[in-house]
UniProtKB/Swiss-Prot annotation:
Membrane topology field: Peripheral membrane protein
Encoding gene per record: ndhH
Keyword terms: Chloroplast, Membrane, NAD, NADP, Plastid, Plastoquinone, Quinone, Thylakoid, Translocase, Transport
GO terms of biological process kind: photosynthesis, light reaction
Protein's UniProt name: NAD(P)H-quinone oxidoreductase subunit H, chloroplastic
Function as written in the Swiss-Prot or TrEMBL entry: NDH shuttles electrons from NAD(P)H:plastoquinone, via FMN and iron-sulfur (Fe-S) centers, to quinones in the photosynthetic chain and possibly in a chloroplast respiratory chain. The immediate electron acceptor for the enzyme in this species is believed to be plastoquinone. Couples the redox reaction to proton translocation, and thus conserves the redox energy in a proton gradient.
PROSITE patterns assigned to the protein according to its UniProt record, in alphabetical order: COMPLEX1_49K
Naturally occurring in which organism (per UniProt): Citrus sinensis (Sweet orange)
Principal location: plastid
Length: 395
């Protein structure tokens, strides 16, 4: 009787995991309730990186706000820039030149590769494999060299503009990028050889954190989290934005819904991104890299613009882009899922409402359900397979 009584009276252990260091998964805190090694409950605590990004947007013009958006998901900044200019472009029915659209696709896919690489390294380190963590920086550095040559910045690029991009591709950049694509395919093959069939890796990820297709839809998951559960859904195919329809590529998806499936989806996406980049580089058309019509100046209404002091275009600020009085939801397929903004204009230069739909925030909601009845060591495997960046989770 005394043994049974002590079993009923035993208390669970509550452990704080985090707040983690910003260089890994971001400043996330998990309050984990344990029964020995078994996880009974897990409560994520968010908000350590909240900076009021939505409110800041409502007090800035689009051009002023562009440098801020690169701080949401700071590992895939091209996507946050893309969604920031896509919304106003759709509101104003602004046509983007074909060359600018091709440049955007190239930059977006390079950014997807860089994001997936910096997911792969820490994910493998979390589950005990240190070697790939050093390998991924080798390829990622080459991507950042390409970004720096084209945009002037390695990470916070501030490259997209309403109606196009800030600058054309420099001389020799296309050949350099094609060389990178050829080299990177051998790098992906090396990762697959090193990781995919490794028995220790499979022991840690196979059958861990399983999500069914219907369950993934009900939770609102997107990106690799959704595609790894057997749902073939990619906004590049669904929404036909930019010029993705002009390229031959396949949506990567798996049926199993576990951490291994999410790994395989992301590895496959890196290969498909290279295919898209190669086709875009080989077929990139000539012409302007931005829609110059929306930057025309009204000479008659402001004659002071044209006097001697202001005759150089560099001294003339871009006209304030006016957001028409309507509402719009725009979205792109970011590396972590569906990144969207709900935008309401009110006939002024500032948005009346700027609602951000971050994929990481919504994908993170399923974490407590996935880790229940799992072992303590599986928490980092499942959290790593979700792929979150707290900059966009907390905004």
């Amino acid at each position: 009787m005394s043994i049974l009584a002590t079993e009923k009276e035993k208390e669970f252990m509550i452990v704080n995991m985090g707040p983690h260091h910003p260089s890994m998964h971001g400043v996330l805190r998990l309050i984990v309730t344990l029964d020995g090694e078994d996880v009974i409950d897990c409560e994520p605590i968010l908000g350590y990186l909240h900076r009021g990004m939505e409110k800041i947007a409502e007090n800035r013009t689009i051009i002023q706000y562009l440098p801020y958006v690169t701080r949401w998901d700071y590992l895939a900044t091209m996507f946050t820039e893309a969604i920031t200019v896509n919304g106003p472009e759709q509101l104003g029915n602004i046509r983007v030149p074909k060359r600018a659209s091709y440049i955007r696709v190239i930059m977006l896919e390079l950014s997807r590769i860089a994001s997936h690489l910096l997911w792969l390294g820490p994910f493998m380190a979390d589950i005990g494999a240190q070697t790939p963590f050093f390998y991924i920086f080798r390829e990622r550095e080459l991507v950042y060299d390409l970004f720096e040559a084209a945009t002037g910045m390695r990470m916070m690029h501030n490259y997209f503009r309403i109606g196009g991009v800030a600058a054309d591709l420099p001389y020799g950049w296309i050949d350099k990028c094609l060389d990178f694509c050829d080299y990177f395919l051998t790098g992906v093959a090396e990762y697959q050889k090193l990781i995919t069939r490794n028995p220790i890796f499979l022991e840690r990820v196979e059958g861990v954190g399983i999500i069914g297709g219907e369950e993934a839809i009900n939770w609102g998951l997107s990106g690799p989290m959704l595609r790894a559960s057997g749902i073939e859904w990619d906004l590049r195919k669904v929404d036909h934005y930019e010029c993705y329809d002009e390229f031959d590529w396949e949506v990567q998806w798996q049926k199993e819904g576990d951490s291994l499936a999410r790994y395989l989806v992301r590895i496959g996406e890196m290969t498909e991104s290279v295919k898209i980049i190669q086709q875009a580089l080989e077929g990139i058309p000539g012409g302007p890299y931005e829609n110059l019509e929306i930057r025309c100046f009204d000479r008659e209404s402001d004659p002071e613009r044209n006097d001697f002091e202001n005759r150089f275009i560099s001294k003339k600020p871009s006209p304030t882009f006016e957001l028409t009085k309507q509402e719009l939801y725009a979205r792109v397929e970011a590396p972590k899922g569906e990144l969207g903004i709900f935008l309401i204009g009110d006939q002024s230069g500032f948005p009346w409402r700027w609602k951000i739909r971050p994929p990481g925030f919504i994908n993170l909601q399923i974490l407590p359900q996935l880790v229940k009845r799992m072992k303590l060591a599986d928490i980092m495997t499942i959290l790593g397979s979700i792929d979150i960046i707290m900059g966009e989770v907390d905004r």
